[in-house]
From Swiss-Prot:
It is a single-pass membrane protein. Induction: Is part of the operon cntOLMI that is negatively regulated by zinc level through the Zur repressor, which leads to transcriptional activation of this operon under zinc depletion. Highly induced in response to airway mucus secretions (AMS) treatment. Its EC number is 1.5.1.-. One of its GO terms (molecular function) is oxidoreductase activity. It is an enzyme of class 1 (oxidoreductase). GO terms for cellular component: plasma membrane. This is Pseudopaline synthase. Keywords: Cell membrane, Membrane, NAD, NADP, Oxidoreductase, Transmembrane, Transmembrane helix. NADP(+) binds at L16, G17, A18, V19, N39, H40, T154, E364. Belongs to the staphylopine dehydrogenase family. Catalyzes the NAD(P)H-dependent reductive condensation of alpha-ketoglutarate to the intermediate formed by the adjacently encoded enzyme PA4836, namely (2S)-2-amino-4-{[(1S)-1-carboxy-2-(1H-imidazol-4-yl)ethyl]amino}butanoate, leading to the production of pseudopaline. This is the last step in the biosynthesis of the metallophore pseudopaline, which is involved in the acquisition of nickel and zinc, and thus enables bacterial growth inside the host, where metal access is limited. Therefore, this enzyme probably contributes to Pseudomonas virulence. The active site is at H219 (proton donor/acceptor). The gene is cntM. Its main location: membrane.
Length: 433
């Protein structure tokens, strides 16, 4: 472990799931001060507390070419109750689902967190930075940083061992925006993530970084549609695969068309908020998963934004067809490459109280898109494609609730009113213009 980085100070991880375990390892390698974690009370938190009491530490296993990321990290303190926090922390890292940012920030005892200089949002959506700033108490001078998305693919290996996680992939590049463009924390986090081989590109505004959250563009058209929801909300039959072509998965010409139209709607929202939109195909290829130039020539990628709608949809379809297998994996003896797209949908399941719950995909994607649509209304944008996807989700979930019975379903299945949060984002945006 390196010497403590004074610009980070003591770091509190808010939320202690798979993402926090990866972040903790990166912070320990870089050199933070004290490292603590806060997790909301519940059965999982109790298991964490019991494991820590037995002397367990955070354990990360890197898979395949990322095996070198493996390691352990000890926590200096763990809290289940925000009321236990003291003014010991200079950096807060929000490792919670993005749709819970507002509730989490409002639930922190800011009267005892006067030393906090920086908040990092690990996977921000469009407007998240403004939303968090709107919830900070008057006089709070903390800088809020937005990462475009979480920079790895990490999961807890076994829920009975909540301190162990597996990282199977790491992004090549993520984007970072700050509420204060000249703040030194941007360079600090660039160095922290470089330790895992991730390039951090600073952008002029938080909204510019948030507009590069890949799940906003991909999950919504693929996983809020009829095919995906039929598999997610069913206990019977094959689960289907998230990134395969129909009939094995949700990818059809229609879904690709929805992706293109959603990108156009999001691009206009970003423009009105003063942020530069992205070239969707270049973003998907260069920053996420590339394909061979035989399938997508460089000129087609770079000229995507200027192409016509039909050409754009063709190029997007070619990309996802090219990623049915990992194009850069070695072929086996039969000449077959790794079945990259065979990621099964997670289905609804009953929680420990016997209530039906949706998996994070598509629940978080629905909530994020609902908030973006409510925000867009302040900029006189109708976003018909986004609204169509929201309606698809709401209708499918409503039918599921009717079938199972309302008493059997967790309240999180019901639609939410995103307008108050959107109003707060818009007021904060107006105050900074």
């Amino acid at each position: 472990m390196n010497a403590a980085d004074e610009s980070l100070g003591n770091v509190l991880l808010v939320g202690l799931g798979a993402v926090a375990i990866q972040v903790a390892l990166d912070l320990r390698r870089h050199g933070a001060g004290r490292l603590g974690a806060l997790n909301h009370p519940g059965r999982r938190s109790q298991r964490i507390a019991e494991a820590l009491a037995r002397g367990a530490c955070l354990q990360l296993e890197g898979q395949g070419q990322h095996r070198w990321l493996s390691g352990n990290a000890a926590l200096d303190v763990f809290h289940q109750d925000p009321a236990e926090l003291r003014d010991d922390w200079q950096t807060l890292v929000l490792c919670v689902p993005a749709d819970s940012y507002l509730d989490v920030v409002r639930g922190l005892p800011w009267e005892r967190l006067g030393g906090v200089r920086t908040l990092l949002l690990v996977s921000a959506f469009i407007g998240a930075n403004l939303l968090v700033r709107s919830a900070l108490p008057a006089g709070c001078q903390a800088t809020v940083l937005s990462l475009s998305s979480y920079y790895a693919a990490t999961k807890v290996i076994d829920e009975t061992q909540p301190l162990r996680a597996l990282t199977k992939a790491v992004k090549r590049r993520v984007y970072l925006g700050s509420s204060r463009p000249d703040c030194p924390a941007r360079e600090t986090w660039r160095r922290v993530l470089a330790g895992s081989g991730v390039e951090v590109v600073p952008l002029a505004t938080p909204e510019a970084a948030e507009g590069r959250n890949v799940t906003t563009y991909v999950h919504s058209p693929f996983f809020l549609g009829e095919f995906a929801l039929a598999r997610i909300l069913s206990e019977q039959g094959p689960p289907g695969f998230m990134y395969k072509l129909y009939p094995e998965g949700p990818i059809t010409p229609g879904a690709i068309g929805a992706m293109r139209r959603l990108w156009c709607e999001l691009s206009e929202l970003l423009r009105r908020m003063g942020a530069e939109p992205l070239n969707l195909l270049r973003f998907l290829n260069d920053d996420n998963y590339p394909v061979h130039e035989t399938m997508l020539p460089r000129a087609s990628i770079d000229g995507f934004a200027e192409a016509g709608a039909e050409r754009q949809e063709y190029l997007l379809f070619v990309r996802y067809a090219a990623l049915l297998v990992d194009p850069f994996s070695p072929a086996d003896e039969q000449g077959r490459h790794f079945d990259f797209s065979a990621v099964p949908f997670r289905r609804v399941s009953r929680d420990e109280d016997g209530l039906w719950r949706l998996p994070r995909v598509p629940l978080e994607d629905y909530r994020k898109l609902a908030l973006i649509v409510a925000l867009a209304a302040h900029f006189d944008l109708a976003m018909p494609q986004a609204r169509s996807l929201l309606a698809s989700y709401e209708n499918a979930v409503s039918r599921f609730i009717d079938c199972q019975g309302a008493s059997q379903c967790h309240p999180s299945l019901y639609p939410i009113d995103s307008r108050p949060a959107a109003d707060a984002i818009y007021r904060q945006w107006c105050s900074t213009c």
